[in-house]
A protein has these predicted regions:
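Alpha-helical recognition segments enriched in aromatics with Gly/Pro capping
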Residues: 1-25
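Feature 926 captures the class I aminoacyl-tRNA synthetase adenylation module centered on the KMSKS loop
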Residues: 19-351
């Protein structure tokens, strides 16, 4: 509840609690944002528990950039430290809370932990442990003002990290998280690496495109995909450095990347972060049935768009209807045009 209320804060408005109340009984039906905050706390707990279960043989030590994912994560962590610190200093609690949720859930949990957990089984286990604990410890300290109880419980069960070492390398851990040293932006500034962030964002774009296509066409997670990526020379170089990360995450049978590669036949195209990702669907889906489905959706969208345009062409409607109603109709027409463009492009992919 505390975290949810913080995410609802703005600089110039009262907090509006998102509760849906039954008009007759006056009882709470649900609170979507509260449920989302609850899910986030559960995510923090489960991610922390997973990492702590994999700390056998761990000893505290300095974090070291060994992979592109490490460089990306440490850079994002440095920016998170700066963002949260400035949020506290400037009283922008809503932006801070939403920002830390996006960082820990979408970047730490969904990507860094997933990419790094394989290293916990190999020769680089100890350094992977140190890097993960460094990220977790810093994140827990950043989230402590927002949700003090769960973070205190997690931190109390964590091993010491590099943040607890004194100048001689001895462990000097605080008795409680609430009096532990705050992560200072100046100490993390050395990790900021824009090139590393760009490289990993490209990796995420390719993997996300493959996963979205797999989900959209209900393909088995075990089904290997043929993926082709077209981008500029610099981006291709960055992607090649992350090939060993992309291939298992996207579960590719083949991964072809280049500046002038051709779009494969019967493939779906996804454009993200300035790169074109083509996922071959031939042999994976019924192309004729999929094309028929898309054409049916196009017909429905065209019909609705024609209705919107007819209404907007009526001068009486535009003059007499509330401005908000007119704008809503215009927004829907614009949205339908975007939908039609996307659907038409998808049909072309199957041609």
């Amino acid at each position: 509840m505390r975290f949810n209320l913080l995410t609802l804060c703005t600089n110039n408005q009262d907090v509006k609690f998102d509760a849906n109340i039954d008009k007759k009984t006056k009882k709470l039906i649900d609170s979507p944002r509260t449920d989302q905050a609850k899910s986030f706390v559960t995510k923090i707990w489960n991610a922390s528990r997973f990492l702590l279960m994999n700390m056998e043989g761990y000893t505290p030590g300095e974090p070291v950039v060994e992979t592109p994912a490490d460089a990306w994560m440490f850079s994002r962590l440095a920016k998170a430290v700066k963002m949260v610190t400035e949020g506290i200093e400037n009283y922008t609690f809503g932006d801070m809370a939403r920002g830390v949720q996006q960082f820990f859930w979408n970047e730490v949990c969904d990507w860094y932990v997933e990419v790094t957990k394989a290293r916990l089984k190999g020769e680089g286990r100890l350094q992977a442990q140190r890097n993960l604990i460094f990220v977790l410890d810093t994140s827990i300290r950043l989230m402590h003002p927002l949700m003090p109880f769960v973070t205190e419980e997690i931190w109390d069960n964590m091993p010491a990290s590099v943040l607890d070492l004194d100048a001689e390398g001895n462990v000097n851990r605080a008795e409680a998280l609430m009096i532990a040293k705050w992560p200072e932006p100046a100490d993390y500034a050395k990790y900021v690496d824009e090139d590393a962030e760009r490289a990993f964002e490209l990796c995420r774009a390719v993997v996300s495109a493959a996963r979205a296509t797999r989900s959209r066409y209900r393909l088995s997670p075990k089904a290997e995909l043929d993926v082709v990526v077209r981008a500029g020379a610099e981006d291709i170089e960055k992607l090649e450095s992350l090939r060993s990360t992309i291939e298992p995450l996207a579960n590719t049978a083949s991964l072809v990347m280049g500046t002038d590669v051709e779009k494969p036949a019967a493939s779906i195209a996804v454009v993200d972060s300035g790169v074109e990702v083509f996922v071959v669907l031939e042999g994976k889906v019924d192309l004729s049935a999929e094309k028929a489905r898309l054409e049916k959706e196009i017909a429905a969208a065209q019909k609705e768009l024609a209705g919107c345009e007819k209404t907007l062409a009526n001068e009486g409607f535009v003059a007499k209807a509330a401005p908000a109603v007119v704008q809503k109709k215009r927004d829907r027409a614009a949205e339908l045009k975007e939908i039609l463009a996307a659907l038409t492009a998808q049909v072309a992919d199957f041609s």
